[in-house]
Amino acid sequence: MRCADGFYYVVKFQNNPQHTRVLVNDWLGTRLGELIGLPMPAVAVVDVHPWLVEHTPELRLELCGQRKMMTAGLSFGSRYVVAPTEGQVFDYLPESAMAQVRNVQDFAGALALDKWTCNANGRQAAFWKKGRERKFTVSFIDQGYCFNAGEWSFPDAPLRGVFGRNDVYACVTGWASFEPWLSRIEAFPESSMWPLAEEIPPEWYGGEAEELEKLLTKLLERRSRVRELIEGFKDSSRNPFVNWKEAIN
């Protein structure tokens, strides 16, 4: 969807089939990623006018064989990582192309974020390049299943919130490979957490301010557990870090 600022956005509506709370998750997950220095798409609150919904056949949802209009009003917008007229975007690259991703090491930081937020989905990524650029940049998209989607719970498991292939973790040789993101999570200031809640429209969490407060409090409590959760993935049957050289104390 092209918005009033001239940029294109992927827009999620309040009555999406996942859960209204996934709008909160997308916002929080993306903003937290930004704050620890990960390449994330810009996000915005998109006010979708009722007229646009009524007169756009594509803004319909198929549920149980019935077509239903998307809900107008405040929606979540994730800006295209590159405009359609300026470059190319791929949601998949083969292993042979990973050498052409200039920031593939950022997957280690995304893993730290996903363990912190208990992303119940596999890590989603967009690989993009402008014009005639030869190398791709990866941006981390779709944080909707952070905090276990609409449940706002944290059922941690070693293989949750990870990318589907190990090759993106080939550069991980020890704890230093998770820096600076891991240290930024562990030292994430409480004073930076609460303003994020003020950015979120109450409609996205049904006005349940206490539930949102509990979620943020739990996130603060989990800062010290991220290293342990990464270690659980390291020791899993996936054997994701084949180049790990550092001994774990």
Regions found by a protein language model. Give the residues of each.
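Catalytic micro-motifs at enzyme active sites that drive phosphoryl/nucleotidyl and oxygen chemistry
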Residues: 63-67, 99, 128
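Short, flexible segments with low predicted structural confidence
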Residues: 4-6, 95, 190-191
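Short alpha-helical "patches" and their helix-cap loops
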Residues: 40-49, 123-130, 232-237
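Conserved kinase catalytic-core helix
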Residues: 86-126, 180-183
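Conserved ATP-binding subdomain of kinase catalytic cores across diverse folds
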Residues: 1-91, 114-120, 136, 143-150, ...
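Aromatic-acidic/polar surface patches that form glycan- and anion
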Residues: 22, 102-106, 208
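C-terminal catalytic region of ATP-dependent kinase domains
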Residues: 14, 130-249
